[in-house]
């Protein structure tokens, strides 16, 4: 969060998109067309997941890809940004070294290609349009298999039951993906899903390799984000393929979480309006309710080396978050000419996407960013409530 306040609109959009590219690319290889191949036999989801985990591993994956991004209206973009507008490219994956994945998205005409690289828990994204490298660490997860091997069907079913309390799961749907027998899983928030409709993932019934991933908005039957590939090959990939060298002059942005410090430079875990209000050096705006949503949490965070505040309202993806930080001169102006809205006696800049909205404005020395998986009208109402 140490750069959100001063980042340009184009870069902010790129970060939102590349974050979803990492999620999709890290879990799936999508196939472009459906063929006439057979479908696998029907089976419970727990059994399908167990069989996928138990399937023999492949030495590597190579594929041509097509990335579709309908988060925002492409007509509002200046130039061809492969992360924002979608693009064709290549994908490689290897199980060596803790797991490696590389996505190459090729920009039309400009030649400003973008690269996504995941090695173990570390990720690096090069945005060729802005000549910026974003890097950081992915959350570490426990190895469920570990020394005990693949989890039992009963254990997997227990996890599915736990997840089912919050997410509606379709079960393992026998599918035909590009002539390959596959199982498709549809997952949708059971409540408080905001603008997120559902996520679909399909995997090869024979080897457990993910074959398709797509994200849908609650307001459209077409995917907002989709990763498609053709000509998939399950062969070993040389380590040299995963060596990416961005230009030496490229700007590097570290997205790793930072330690939050108090006014005296000491680490702080301030929680609650009173504690956070005492930790920041600006008037904290934290009403008990905002846009009809009850206050959920007030937490101290780090912005530009200074203590700032994160105030959340509501629950789940239908909630709203407010980031408040002390204003500084020199912030970059938006590059896409986004709509301006009036918030009280000041003007704000608003970004609306198929999966959520964000609005930022400054008032009396404080910068505000209001964001949520909600329509623009909801973040506008929240901003006015501040």
Q: Where do the PLM segments sit?
A:
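Short, solvent-exposed recognition patches
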Residues: 71, 79-87, 258-366, 374-384
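Gly/Pro-enriched, hydrophobic low-complexity segments
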Residues: 104, 124, 170-253
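An acidic-aromatic
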Residues: 88-151, 218, 222-226, 359
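Short beta-strand segments that buttress and anchor functional surface loops
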Residues: 65-66, 102-106, 183-191, 213-216, ...
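C-terminal region of N-terminal signal peptides and the immediate post-cleavage residues
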Residues: 4-8, 24-52
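N-terminal export and membrane-targeting signals
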Residues: 1-19
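A short, surface-exposed beta-strand/turn
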Residues: 87, 92-95, 116-126, 198-214, ...
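A short, Trp-centered hydrophobic/proline-enriched beta-strand micro-motif
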Residues: 54-76, 99-103
